[in-house]
Amino acid sequence: MNRLTSWINDTHAAPSGAAFAFVAPQHNQPVFDIEESTEDVIDAAVQSAQQAFLQNKRSTLAQRTAWLNLLAQVLEANAARLAEIICQDVGKPIRAANFEAGRGAQFARACAAAVQQLAGEVVPVDAAAAGAGHFGFTRHVPIGVVAAITPFNAPINLLVQKLAPALAT
């Protein structure tokens, strides 16, 4: 039986030894084993995410828009396969799984469009006499790594609903 491990920084995490069987809801039979993530594996994932954040925190709105549009393109290009996986994973009917795969791409595109609206504000700071004639401004900037736990019942949609806004902002 195949064994799935965590995928961190373009590589599989080292096996911990502990795993559990994934049982397909369609036939109630084990399909593959899933490696349990140890504290070390989780720490490695957080460190990898932090490293990626440091490399990308100065990304432009255009870059973030491009990333989100690429996410939508990848979801659309793989929609049929993703729908099959959703069916196997949670036992959804294919029609619902197809809808979910498409909805993830739509949400990513919506977030890409929203990035273009992330303008700062110019704020007068003349509440104090020394601020007369002066202005401050606000700007949206990334602040760090996001951890998200996604429920099982809509794996693509709920993941994208957490991932895309984090990439957008």
Locate predicted features.
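Hydrophobic face of amphipathic alpha-helices that form TPR/SEL1-like repeat modules
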Residues: M1-P30, P124
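Hydrophobic aliphatic residue packing
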Residues: I8, I34, I42, V46, ...
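N-terminal alpha-helical segment of soluble enzymes
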Residues: G17, P25-V90, I94
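Conserved short alpha-helical elements in the N-terminal third of ANL/AMP-binding
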Residues: L163-T169
